[in-house]
Amino acid sequence: MTEKERNKTEPREHKVTNPYSGQSEMLTATEYAYYFLIKYAERTGDYNAMQKGLSKFSSLNAKAYMTLLD
């Protein structure tokens, strides 16, 4: 089972809100981990890690990517 397939069966337990728009999305544990990695990489200036995280997150949940990170 691929990560994308496994992600479809995970419960959406983590509510994340875009601080600029106020819109929220419910994320799986996997998506939440990528979101946290992206925001941490952004704060620390690790743009290579941030870009990899953005790519992976957007492939797992395009709607949440557009709401939270785009």
Where do the protein language model's features map onto the residues?
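N-terminal acidic leader/helix
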Residues: M1-A41
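Intrinsic-disorder/low-complexity regions
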Residues: K4-R6, T17, G45, L60, ...
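Generic detector of short alpha-helix boundary/capping microenvironments
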Residues: E10, A49-M50
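Preference for short coil/turn "hinge" residues that link or interrupt alpha-helices
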Residues: Y20, M50-G53
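Charged, low-complexity interaction regions
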Residues: E42-N48
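Short, compact, well-ordered microdomains
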Residues: K52-D70
